[in-house]
Amino acid sequence: MDTVSLEHQIQSVQRHISFLKKEQMALLRDLHLEILRLQKRCSELTHDLEMREAQSHQQEAASRELESKCRALESQLEARAAANAELRREVAQREALVSALRCSLRTEERRFLEELRRRSHRATVLGTELQKHTEAAAYLSCQLHAARQRLQAPRPGPGATAEPRPRRRALRARRPPAAHEAAAKGPGRDWAAWDRGAGALDDADPMPDPALFLYARRPLRPSARSPRQPPPQEPPDRAGPQPAPSQPSAPGDPE
């Protein structure tokens, strides 16, 4: 009985040992598979880490490149800001120059207008003086004509002493109005009345052209004369001695 029981115990132990071996082999296989899986996972993680490190290096290089580009752009921006400030200063200077030129142009325009006004006034004054001188020349030519007529008139005999009275009156009628009458009537009316009176007298005794007395006569050239033509006779107004007419101070002054 003891031997049978011992054999049964040995068999049971052997069965237990084989079972444990099987369990151990299964456990070892599972452990090996787990180790392989973990190794694969470690390799994957290592690869991921390496990729991430490479990406981080690339990102750092890209960030450094971007930083250098940003610095270059900042320097360009500063240069453009300085150029813009310089352009603003230049524009301000040109605006000041333009305003100064406008002021000088306005001053020159005002000065030109004043000079134009002054010259226009002087031209008016000179025109008035020229008109006065023309009237004085006409008056002097009338006096000269009257004096020549008096010199060329035949001297009356002893019995006809009363005839020159109308001539004196006619000469007095030729005189321009007096200064107080001219001031009372105005420069337009007195000369108009005097011209009408002188025109009425000139109808009876015409007066020569005043231009003959205002401009010197040009002598004729000897070559222009024909040998058959008679020599030019002296005009009657140069026949006798002529008194030099006294030039009045104003056309309205009496003789």
UniProtKB/Swiss-Prot annotation:
Pfam families: CCDC92. InterPro entries: CCDC74A/CCDC74B/CCDC92, CCDC92/74_N. Residues 166-177 have a biased composition (Basic residues). Residues 28-90 form a coiled coil. The keyword Coiled coil applies. The keyword Coiled coil applies. Residues 149-255 are annotated as: Disordered. This is Coiled-coil domain-containing 92B. Keywords: Coiled coil. Disulfide bonds: none annotated. It comes from Homo sapiens. Residues 242-255 have a biased composition (Pro residues). Signal peptide: none annotated.
